[in-house]
Amino acid sequence: MSDDRLGLGRERRFLVLLGIICLALIGGALYMQVVLGEAPCPLCILQRYALLLIALFAFIGAAMSSRRGVTVMETLVVICALAGAGVAGHHVYTQFYPSVSCGIDVLQPIVDSLPLAKIFPLGFQVDGFCSTPYPPILGLSLAQWALVAFVLTVILVPLGVVRNRKKTY
């Protein structure tokens, strides 16, 4: 097996792992919503969309056979992770300064009109306020954990590309 195919294989395995992790994070959010009664706010739902898109692009990228196709999907993964980091960062800011709410009356109709809110309302329909504090997990709020996950994705995907595609002479 050539070095080129080996590097692409590593990237594919990493993309599959990333997709599984994103789906697990969405599953964890649904568990907290349904079992623990933590109502999702508009920013929570937008973060779920970002995680879902990252998983989708990661799985598509893992199925691609060409280097160019994998690169395009990895680029889309990073773009979605940047968007998710922006939303999570705003969510963290809103939780630190509760007087600056996300405005459920402004974002709720927009988020609730997105297609998945109609198809799968349990997972993608707004129910709460962004400034509502929930118990932290290992010292961090859910928004902070989401921010960590998105930032790690933005850093690790390009690092994996550079590492796996480095030419040896």
From Swiss-Prot:
GO MF, one annotated term: protein-disulfide reductase activity
Keyword Lipid metabolism in record: no
Keywords: Cell inner membrane, Cell membrane, Chaperone, Disulfide bond, Electron transport, Membrane, Oxidoreductase, Redox-active center, Transmembrane, Transmembrane helix, Transport
Cytoplasmic side: 1-14, 65-71, 164-169
Record field: transmembrane: 15-31, 50-64, 72-89, 145-163
Membrane topology (Periplasmic): 32-49, 90-144
GO BP terms in the entry: protein folding
Residue pairs linked by disulfide bridges in the UniProt entry: C41-C44, C102-C130
Cell compartments where the protein resides: Cell inner membrane
Membrane topology: Multi-pass membrane protein
Coiled-coil ranges (or none): none
GO cellular component: plasma membrane
Keyword Membrane: yes
Pfam family, one: DsbB
Recorded family membership: Belongs to the DsbB family.
Biological role stated in the UniProt entry: Required for disulfide bond formation in some periplasmic proteins. Acts by oxidizing the DsbA protein.
Entry protein name: Disulfide bond formation protein B 1
Source organism (scientific name): Pseudomonas fluorescens (strain ATCC BAA-477 / NRRL B-23932 / Pf-5)
